[in-house]
From Swiss-Prot:
Lineage of the organism: Bacteria, Pseudomonadati, Pseudomonadota, Gammaproteobacteria, Pseudomonadales
GO cellular component terms given for this protein: cytosol
HAMAP family (UniProt xref): RecA
Presence of keyword Transmembrane helix: no
Family matches, as Pfam families: RecA, RecA_C
Protein name: Protein RecA
Native source organism of the sequence: Azotobacter vinelandii (strain DJ / ATCC BAA-1303)
Length: 349
């Protein structure tokens, strides 16, 4: 850059700083770049699929899927992991359906959890904004977008038409709180439901509620689905779950993770550690026996998982090795369970 341009730029920057305050415009090379801080989801496979070890702080995340697919379980698991790091968490329960006993079973410290059950969508989003601006809350869950009913709809008659009210409410709220979320370094997770578009002949007829604004403002969008049942003898004790990362602004998208959610217990984390440990050679499997560093730890996956539960230091060591290998690995080096989805899959999402 020649001298005249340098002087002109310096004058412009000085004027901007004088008018808008120091830091209004910065040169990126003047400050050391730092990795985006993340909060674990409670699922090792999903943390790796997200590319940074969890959900990004200072960003908006959307988690959507059909009923009983594990959306609330995943968010409560995220709260439990955040609380282990000393984070303050809030749950905006617009559906009025939060079960404290179930949350406690997943490891959530319900005594320290902030809970709000707002009457209207406007109230829910205003509470969310105020919590963000306090700079004292690290994780906020909004459950769910579909339950954020505008005040005009609540006060109106049952059959009244209110076209686009919820979409306008979400658009206005997200414009307002996005900057505050970044400044507060707060993770805000919106749970959303799926609806069917009428008259779609080709492509995916599924869409999410609340208009398009959340799709744009969200840095990460997760599609969670129940793919099967986990059985013990003839009794169903959980569900097989698949999560696709359909949008990711902080790492490559279209990755997916598969794990089990056990009823009353949550995400089967030790099962993930065993599966990924075997695929990476950190654990050895010979017939039905699993071994770690030459010592047998159990016959069958359930017994091996029990060993890891009784020996958390071994589980932590294996998990750390898995994270160290996979979070720095290219896509070609990842196990099949964490493979990328085709780039053209689910474009409608």
């Amino acid at each position: 850059m020649d001298e005249n341009k340098k002087r002109a730029l310096a004058a412009a920057l000085g004027q901007i700083e004088k008018q808008f305050g120091k830091g209004a415009v910065m040169r990126m090379g003047d400050h050391e770049r730092q990795a985006i801080p993340a909060i674990s989801t409670g699922s090792l496979g999903l943390d790796i699929a997200l590319g940074i070890g969890g959900l990004p702080k200072g960003r908006i995340v959307e988690i959507y899927g059909p009923e009983s697919s594990g959306k609330t379980t995943l968010t409560l698991s995220t709260i439990a992991e955040a609380q282990k790091q000393g984070a303050t968490c809030a749950f905006v329960d617009a559906e009025h359906a939060l079960d404290p006993d179930y949350a406690a079973k997943l490891g959530v410290n319900v005594d320290d959890l902030l809970v709000s059950q707002p009457d209207t969508g406007e109230q829910a989003l205003e509470i969310t904004d105020m919590l963000v601006r306090s700079n004292a809350v690290d994780v906020i869950i909004v459950d769910s977008v579909a339950a954020l009913v505008p005040k005009a709809e609540i006060e109106g008659e049952m059959g009244d038409q209110h076209v686009g009210l919820q979409a306008r409410l979400m658009s206005q709220a997200l414009r307002k709180i996005t900057g505050n979320i970044k400044n507060a370094n707060c993770l805000v997770i919106f749970i959303n439901q799926i609806r069917m578009k009428i008259g779609v002949m080709f492509g995916n007829p599924e869409t999410t509620t609340g208009g398009n604004a959340l799709k744009f403002y969200a840095s990460v969008r997760l599609d969670i689905r129940r793919t099967g049942a986990v059985k013990e003898s003839d009794e169903v004790i959980g569900s097989e779950t698949r999560v696709k990362v359909v949008k990711n602004k902080v790492a490559p998208p279209f990755r997916q993770a598969e794990f089990q959610i056990l009823y009353g217990k949550g995400i089967y984390r030790n099962g993930e550690i065993i599966d990924l440990g075997v695929q990476l050679g950190l654990l050895e499997k010979s017939g039905a026996w699993y071994s770690y560093q030459g010592s047998k730890i159990g016959q069958g996956k359930a017994n091996a998982a029990k060993f890891l539960e009784d020996n958390p230091e071994v589980a932590a060591a294996v998990e750390k090795s898995i994270r160290d290998q996979l979070l720095a690995a290219p896509a070609s080096a990842r196990p099949a369970a964490l493979a990328d989805e085709p780039a053209d899959a689910d474009l409608d999402y």
